[in-house]
């Protein structure tokens, strides 16, 4: 069904947790649905910076873009944590991990309250997508760059994606990682 979002601004990503959908987007737009997407309400945040990614874990939503923000009340109210700019966020093993331009990786083990910059080995490459599965985080981006962490985002190693195209998004399901990008789909072999 096509339902009204209640906004004229672009929405970029959606996450689900605690029976709540949260969608984030252009100029700080935050939309919240607690009835399986039938109706959408505004979350309260005092800024108008773009939000590109959102994830849920441990009863906390974390959204990021030109700011890191978090909500512990199912997206009704949001607090700014950092002014660092990132593109995507994922949650796994009680850890939030965010990625962004020039190989930026940050992680949080306290539900998004504080963040630690990590060395990704991807300096010079914009990272656009991030996911968690099989106790690993994977991030991907510019020029086919693909990196993984097996220790909750603390350290990262390069993985040969076998492509040089821009990669934009990655997901995990049925024991496979699938990344997509510019005229490209990559699938993990193990």
Briefly describe each language-model feature range.
Residues 1-190:
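Residue-level hotspots at or immediately adjacent to binding/recognition sites across diverse folds
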């Amino acid at each position: 069904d096509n339902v009204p979002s209640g906004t004229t601004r672009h929405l970029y990503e959606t996450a689900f947790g605690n029976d709540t959908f949260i969608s984030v987007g252009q100029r700080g737009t935050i939309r919240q649905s607690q009835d399986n997407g039938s109706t959408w309400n505004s979350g309260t945040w005092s800024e108008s910076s773009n939000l590109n990614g959102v994830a849920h874990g441990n009863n906390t939503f974390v959204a990021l873009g030109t700011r890191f923000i978090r909500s512990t009340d199912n997206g009704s109210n949001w607090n700014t944590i950092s002014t660092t700019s990132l593109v995507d966020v994922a949650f796994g093993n009680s850890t939030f991990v965010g990625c962004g331009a020039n190989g930026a990786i940050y992680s949080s083990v306290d539900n998004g309250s504080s963040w630690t910059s990590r060395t990704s080995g991807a300096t010079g490459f914009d990272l656009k997508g991030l996911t968690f599965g099989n106790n690993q985080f994977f991030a991907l981006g510019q020029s086919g760059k693909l990196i993984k962490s097996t220790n909750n985002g603390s350290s990262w190693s390069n993985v040969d994606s076998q492509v040089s195209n821009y990669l934009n998004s990655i997901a995990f399901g049925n024991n496979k990682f699938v990344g997509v990008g510019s005229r490209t789909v990559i699938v993990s072999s193990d």
